[in-house]
Amino acid sequence: MTIPTTGLIFLFGVFVYFYLSIKFYRCYKEEDNRIAKFFSYGFFLIGLNYVVETAPILFFIDDPGVWRILAPFYVCFMTSGWVLIAYAVFSSVLPSYSKAIGVFFSCIVLLSVFPFLFYTPKYFYVNGVLDWSFESIPHVAPFFFVPFVFTPLILSSMIIIFFLKAKNAQNRKVKIRSLGLAIAMFFMLLGMFVDLILITIGDVHPVYSDLNYLVVFTILAFTLIFSWFPPKSKYVTKIE
């Protein structure tokens, strides 16, 4: 019997992101804090992304018609979720440019979803692990590289910001949480490299992508869930 490895790992991710969403939402309601609200909505959308992906993966569904319908939704949920979190971070660091940052990130969401409305990669399974490839070069191919161009730049900037927050934080739990976010985002960057270069081009087994997802989810679970506490306003306003 083949075990749906990717599906089980993504299911774990669903619980992690939804739990984080609940925690930040409670913080938002208690503190009436704008940043906590964006984090809550962002984690909720990312969790929805994994719900949409996990359902067919658990049952090894590789029907192109199914993925053609689901792909625009999960890409929209994933991109929108991280964009909300990124907007909360960058708009607090550069408040005078918050509107421009919002427009920029909105364009990234639209450009990321656009190609999946016209073309969907081929999804298949290798020993219970989800893999994907391009059967042919689509006419919207340049748009597929939008996330791979801007996401590393955005994640790299956020990694630096959270490392600095961890370095300057006085509260131990705040320090752990900021450091955990930075490390998790580093592994997200590593995951992009694994997916795009090693697996797609280098023909490496896709299980390494799953392992990277598992590392990210585990880091988030330990650093954010188990070190959670209702932050005081002076910390939240600094995104700590």
Regions found by a protein language model. Give the residues of each.
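Alpha-helical transmembrane segments of polytopic integral membrane proteins
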Residues: F18-I22, V83-A86, S156, I160
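Juxtamembrane "helix-exit" motif on the non-cytosolic side of transmembrane helices
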Residues: A55-D63, F118-V129, F193-D203
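Extracellular-loop-to-transmembrane junctions of the mid-late helices
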Residues: T2-V14, F114-I161, P206
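Juxtamembrane loop-transmembrane helix junctions in multi-pass integral membrane proteins
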Residues: M1-G7, C27-R34, D62-P72, W132-P142, ...
